[in-house]
Amino acid sequence: MKKLCIFCGARPNFIKVAPIIRVIDRLSEGNNPHQVSYSLVYAGSENDPTLEDQLFENLSIRRPDVYLGVECENLNELTGQVMSKFEKYLQENPSDVVIVVDDLASTMAAAIVTKKQAIALAHIAAGTRSFDITMPKEINRLVIDGLSDILFTAGFSNNSIANKEGAELSKVYMVGNILIDNIRFDRERISGMTLSDIDELAGLPLKEGNYLVFTLNRKALLADQDNLEQMLRVLSETAGEMPIIAPLRDSAVQVIMALSLKKNIKLHNLHIVKPLGYLEFAYLTAQAKGIITDSGNVAEEATFNGVPCITLNSYTEHIETVKVGSNVLVGEDPELLRSALTDMVAGTWKKCGVPERWDGRSAERVIQILLERQ
């Protein structure tokens, strides 16, 4: 039996590893239940408020088996603590393969420890680059990919990046975007939903296909208040009477509300709501007229759903969302935002499609490859 350790450093990681866990669970219930087993390890604590029970219920996976209990803001301290605690875990719980996902500091720490323990390392969402070495996450990506024995990529552009940086061809596998597995898995459950099923939206005058969704989380965007002021004005003015639903965390809400009061920004059509559950947010975005976001994951899901998406960033880790999909990059430029938003509201968006292998079977490919490799 092959023993896998699946490592998660933060809430979004669980969403990306959930399809893998579901595939393993199906195998354990099949004719050959002894092929593979797994343990799910989380860098944080058991009482982490971002890990609500509903998340795991929506994803149809169990809660982590192990919590390392690391809680600190300083990335260097966090890296050291994760390395120390994860090393002890691996020494006490031998594994054949450690699976990591994305580009967090905790992910890099787990990758380093895995290689020091001479355990095979598999990286999901490998080969993603911003080409901005001043970004901490870019450093993490370079380290994780450089250490990985198996690199699972979402697109051919990611393969090309990994190969150019020296990864052997035999180590790189284009399996598709694993986020899409969740959307396909959830389609039947979401199909019976309506906007009225979402408590946070009660009382809002919403109709499917006739509202916008706005998410904002990047610290750099929130910190530049002069530019944020301009972008909020453009957002509200250009949307006109179309409602804008903004499921935002407290830090973003505080910045936006303080700025609107200080600068007298009229946000008559912006409806700020609390963060939604996983399935609720999936339905909200799938039924939207368009999405304005700084999240790469949200943009990827929008591409699969064919929903117009404006990304408030000058780059994307998955360029397929721009070249093939429904995504448009406007950076932090208010006038580019105005132009793109005008097209979005008018319904004159570009033609778009779904990138190759974004078919909901990425996790199956991952597990098949891991089982076939010696």
Question: Could you say what each language-model-derived stretch is?
Answer:
Residues 1-244, 251-374:
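Nucleotide-activated sugar donor-binding and catalytic core shared by glycosyltransferases
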